[in-house]
Design a protein with these regions (language model features):
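N-terminal hydrophobic targeting/anchoring segments and the immediately downstream early-domain regions
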Residues: 1-154, 209-342
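Divalent metal-binding pocket/active-site signature
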Residues: 115-118, 129-212
Length: 342
């Protein structure tokens, strides 16, 4: 049973790689497959605002990265155009509000790293015209713009092209995402940024010492920009052993205590559901596992979006005030997007 408070919430998730699963199908099937496979899960979880990252797997890099980037952006547009009674692709805060008022799920496009753009900073305006409103500049490893998570030993910040990319994103109104950026790169961005940034799917390094998580100093610095940190549900980033639901709640509470309750959101990263949907499972072969990460692991009950009411319930049981739970479940992200996207 869904809690009344969960039904009141503008449940928002800053990271669901469902585009990978949908775009793996022939384009004629995109709208129908989303409606059949993913829409019921989003509705069951009460999701009202969903960020759709465009992630390009190694199979497409480097030669096919731009084509796959455009293909996945097109996939998001086809999903929205083919399901006008259920979802709407939004590029401004006003459009998000209109979608919510119409009872639709608001979708926002993001780029998770930019392998398709490489160092061509001028192409950032192109993807902005296509609807991208959030972007990061690195994933695992090194890019022409910055070193990603796991490359902290290099001590490298943003390259000159990376600095130009940050400036161009701020000019255009694209939100800079620091998730997956190396530690020195995060510090560099926070030094240069003149507008609020976000971490779309990162948890607390104080609780799980993993390079994908943020230190308390980084959490406070993101909050100081006016930004938001969206907690990642992925099991390997929550605990060194098998992650539990309580581990996840600990990360929410820790980030709220360090960054402030107005700077916490959800960036669930339901990897397992995406992996199970992929046909063929090209993204599961070697890539994630070679980095010591099991893409099929998950927190019990949170295999996919349908489990999100459990988070509302869990936060309430931890003693958080209802208003604070509503902020975490999506109120903060909704406010942040309205402020940043206009």
């Amino acid at each position: 049973m869904t809690l009344p408070l969960h039904q009141q919430a503008i449940v928002a998730d800053a990271h669901n790689d469902l585009l990978m699963a949908v775009a793996a199908r022939p384009h004629e099937q995109w709208a129908e497959f989303f409606r059949r496979q993913w829409l019921p899960q989003l509705r069951a979880g009460g999701v009202r605002l969903q960020v759709l990252p465009v992630f390009i797997d190694d199979e497409f890099r480097p030669e096919g990265a731009l084509r796959q980037t455009l293909r996945m952006i097109e996939c998001a547009h086809v999903i929205a155009e083919g399901n006008p009674d259920a979802v709407r692709l939004c590029s401004t805060g006003a459009e998000i509000d209109a979608a919510l008022a119409d009872g639709l799920i608001a979708l926002v496009l993001a780029l998770e790293s930019m392998p398709g753009l490489d160092a061509s900073v001028e192409l950032i305006s192109t993807v902005h015209r296509l609807g991208v409103r959030i972007a990061s500049i690195a994933h695992w490893g090194r890019t022409p713009l910055a070193d990603g998570s796991g490359e902290d030993a290099t001590g490298s910040g943003l390259t000159s092209d990376g600095v130009a990319a940050l400036a161009e994103m701020e000019r255009l109104g694209i939100i800079f995402d620091i998730s997956h950026l190396g530690a020195t790169g995060v510090a560099h961005v926070l030094e240069l940024a003149t507008k609020p940034v976000m971490a779309t799917h990162s948890s607390a390094r104080a609780l799980r010492d993993h390079h994908r998580n943020l230190t308390d100093e980084q959490l406070r610095a993101v909050a100081a920009t006016g930004g938001i940190i969206c907690v990642n549900f992925f099991h390997a980033f929550l605990s060194e052993t098998k992650a539990t639901f309580d581990d996840l709640l600990d990360h929410f509470e820790h980030i709220a205590a360090v960054a402030g309750i107005d700077h916490v959101g959800i960036g669930a990263d339901f990897v397992r559901e995406v992996m199970l949907d992929l046909t063929p499972p090209w993204c599961c072969e070697g890539d994630a596992n070679s980095r010591g990460v099991d893409p099929f692991g998950y927190v019990e009950g949170l295999e996919g979006p349908a489990g999100l009411p459990l988070v509302t319930e869990g936060l309430l049981k931890r003693g958080l005030a209802e208003d604070d739970v509503l902020k975490i479940m999506g109120g903060n992200m909704h406010r942040f997007f309205k402020e940043r996207l206009g």
